[in-house]
Amino acid sequence: DYRTAPAKVEEMGGYSVLNHVGDWVNSNRYPERSHWDVFITYFANIFKDYHTCLGMEIKNNTDNVTRADRALWDELLQVVIPKGRNIWAFADDDSEKLNEVGRSFELFVLPENNENAVKKAMKDGNFFAASRYHKTTDGIGEFEGDGNVPLVTDIRVNKKENTITVAADPDRDCEVIEWIADGKVIATGNTIDLNDYEDELGCYIRFQMKGSGGVTYSQPFELRYSGRVDKPVPDWALWIFRTEPGQKFMKFYHSRTFALGALVAEKIRIFIEDKIKK
């Protein structure tokens, strides 16, 4: 249950973040679940109802359980931003041992280093998520960096020209800057001219920087323009969380019996597909 904690934290006047949701969704094993309406609806309504829930982890520890969480984040951005708020990206060690410190972390942009400045930056999204580790759902392009992740030294938004330009710290390796809209990489490079990608844009754009040290993620830039077509929250799936039959289904869904059945079904599917290919 991811809803109870944000509700109580907001009631008490605090801020919350949803951690490693892929653990609960089990999307690290079944990445397609990051695109299921039932989970998009569930988490979207948490962010809609509790604005003190600032965002979600897109990286946790070595990224094993969160490898599919960027996909869910992108799905949520498409339906939550049109409702009047953003979802900030977080990355955390989840460290239980000293040697786990420094695996995934945030880089805050602060006028001074104190508690109030950190809280304000968290609330406003003035920080980057970063990690030494990059895992993918298909295993392609995975790597472990040395921790010296790419750093952003400047971001310039030209509203007249519709461009965004990012400057990277020359002392940190940055092999590529990828620009992502609706979950897809649509451009690479330090500058994106949004006019060149009008047919591929939705309500946001974000970038990620990859280098030998790891990956650094920006927060989403909301795009406001005439003719923007927004995706609705797939509220048809709310019955699962608001009715007794739905609650029984979710209890069964998170049971070992269901997990075992899903695993067997997946093995059968792979076996059949391999036979067809041969």
Spans of model-derived segments:
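C-terminal functional module detector
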Residues: V80-W88, D93-K277
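Domain-core and long-helix interface of multi-subunit machines
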Residues: D1-R103, R172-I186, E198, C203
